[in-house]
Amino acid sequence: MDIQFTTKSQDALGAAVRIAAANGNPQVEPLHLLDSLLQQGEGIATALLSAVGVDVPGLTFQIRGALTGLPSASGSSVSAPQLSQAAYKVLNAAERFAKERGDEYVSTEHLLIALAKDGGPGVSDRLT
């Protein structure tokens, strides 16, 4: 994958991997990415969601609850979480949105748009 990400987007992806690992999830899902965007204290994602009337604390609570329902594994043979097909779909959609706007880098705004449009059940329906 040769998508170029802004620093904030890279931070969000790294946080999504850490969230998945902390929960014992073998794959990084769009839910992890959304949770990581919501955790960026002064990030644009929470500001945009608040501006359109989303109850961000309520959404965060819902997402955290949904994360507990994802498959998990434990033990010494568990490897680092890998991106799921759904997460790849979101990243590719974010890259497409960035290119459509003439942007060279995928920003957190592009990730949020991609999650809303292509995040799949449990993500897109919470954002639209």
Predicted regions and their residues:
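Histone-fold recognition with a strong bias for associated Lys/Arg-rich disordered tails
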Residues: 1-128
